[in-house]
């Protein structure tokens, strides 16, 4: 049995977001992190590994520098990693990305007892589409918004978050799950894990490795094969600075009334 976890390197949106003159994100000038929801998916896989001894494989699609993120996943406890990277894959939207990742997972083999895990969504797009699209292309049953996961043999029980509560679903493996932050608290890398990470396999899968898969076609991958594209990204205008009024209730009310009167609001 193995668990394949799809992770993504994303811009750290907690810092300043840089935008190019053409409206696209200037990713080169921004710090990158592992997508937070993907970290929860990885932690869920590692917990099952701790309990069962299964193998955990991490996969990402991205440029060569994303290998550093994969090393971090290996340091956390994953057993092997695959970087799916090629110029032909550049500019892919969620549809094209899911085509490529599904082909990569098909190459690795998704067998009877296996589970595929993804984060709910990536913070750079917030679409929550890639995981379900991979499941559709690989003909896997899927459960999204997993807040609790229990595996018993070839059956997985998932507590799925809804807008106003939860529902419990049972599914047979192989299956795909998307995970949310409420699922767990990701572990930290250990010093020993960092050293061990460089002894674990990290393999690059390029276009030549995947081109024979029926999902890989020039019309369905990369920028040209993407039905959607980002027209423009922009930072919203900065809001006005807030004002703090100090004093007792009567005093602050008088100050506020004076300010509103000066602005002809009252």
Task: Give the residues covered by each predicted segment.
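N-terminal glycine-rich FAD/FM-binding segment characteristic of electron-transfer flavoproteins
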Residues: 1-266
């Amino acid at each position: 049995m193995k668990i394949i976890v799809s992770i993504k390197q994303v811009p750290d949106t907690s810092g300043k977001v840089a935008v190019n003159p053409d409206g696209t994100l200037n990713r080169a000038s921004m710090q990158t992190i592992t997508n937070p929801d993907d970290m929860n998916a990885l932690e869920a896989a590692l917990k099952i590994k701790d309990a069962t001894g299964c193998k955990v494989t991490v996969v990402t699609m991205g440029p060569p520098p994303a290998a550093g993120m994969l090393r971090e996943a290996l340091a956390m406890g994953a057993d092997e990693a695959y970087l799916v990277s090629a110029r032909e894959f550049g500019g892919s939207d969620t549809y094209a990305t899911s085509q490529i990742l599904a082909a990569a997972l098909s190459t690795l083999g998704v067998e009877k007892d296996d589970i595929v895990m993804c984060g709910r969504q990536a913070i750079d797009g917030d679409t929550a589409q890639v995981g379900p699209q991979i499941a559709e292309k690989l003909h896997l049953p899927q459960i999204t918004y997993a807040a609790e996961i229990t595996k018993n043999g070839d059956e997985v029980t998932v507590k799925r978050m809804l807008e106003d509560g939860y529902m419990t679903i049972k599914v047979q493996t192989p299956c795909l799950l998307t995970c949310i932050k409420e699922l767990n608290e990701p572990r930290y890398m250990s010093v020993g894990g960092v050293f061990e990470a460089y002894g674990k396999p990290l393999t690059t899968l390029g276009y030549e490795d995947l081109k024979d898969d029926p999902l890989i076609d020039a019309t369905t991958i990369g920028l040209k094969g993407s039905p959607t594209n980002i027209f423009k990204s922009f930072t919203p205008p900065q809001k006005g600075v807030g004002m703090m009024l100090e004093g007792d209730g009567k005093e602050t009310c008088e100050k506020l009334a004076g300010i509103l009167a000066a602005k002809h609001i009252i």
